[in-house]
Each structure stands twice: as structure tokens, then as C-alpha cells.
Swiss-Prot record:
One GO-annotated biological process of the protein: defense response
Function field: Antimicrobial peptide.
Major localisation: secreted
Species whose genome carries this gene: Pelophylax fukienensis
Disulfide links within the chain: 68-74
Tissue expression: Expressed by the skin glands.
Cellular localization per UniProt: Secreted
Keyword field: Amphibian defense peptide, Antimicrobial, Cleavage on pair of basic residues, Disulfide bond, Secreted, Signal
Protein name per Swiss-Prot or TrEMBL: Pelophylaxin-2
Superkingdom, taxonomy of origin: Eukaryota
Prosequence residues removed at maturation: 23-42
InterPro entries assigned to the protein according to its UniProt record, in alphabetical order: Antimicrobial_frog_2 (IPR012521), Frog_antimicrobial_propeptide (IPR004275)
Signal peptide: 1-22
Length: 74
């Protein structure tokens, strides 16, 4: 069970890094293109916000479970 949680946290960490790199690239592209926003970028932004929200919720749940196991009471 611990190995599974460890791998989930690892994937969460990698996903966070990938999202930050994508945001940096998009920021650089906007500076070059005069900050034009297309429908595709809007959809991508909605998807990224949804993924970020889900990742925050998963992290919160994992931290709550970890806190329960450490303190011994839930």
C-alpha cells in the first residue's frame, strides 16, 4: 500500500513539473505573438485549471490520511 502511495506522489510531482514547464512555454509564446488568445488556448487553460484543482484535492486527501496515520486518530 505504501509503495502505491509513493508512486502516486511521484506522478503528482512529475505532473506538477510538467504543468509549470507548459505554463512557462505558453508565457514565452504569448510574449512573442503579442498575447493573442485562441479558442484552443482557452480550452487548454480550462483543462489545466481542472487538472490543477483535481491535483490539489488529491494532495489534500493524501495529506489528511497521512496526518491521521501519524497522529493515530481520525
Amino acid at each position: 500500500m505504501f509503495t502505491m502511495k509513493k508512486s502516486l506522489l511521484f506522478f503528482f510531482f512529475l505532473g506538477t513539473i510538467a504543468l509549470s514547464l507548459c505554463e512557462e512555454e505558453r508565457g514565452a509564446d504569448e510574449e512573442e505573438n503579442g498575447a493573442e488568445i485562441t479558442d484552443e488556448e482557452v480550452k487548454r487553460g480550462i483543462l489545466l485549471n481542472t487538472l490543477k484543482g483535481a491535483a490539489k484535492n488529491v494532495a489534500g486527501v493524501l495529506l489528511d490520511k497521512l496526518k491521521c496515520k501519524i497522529t493515530g486518530g481520525c
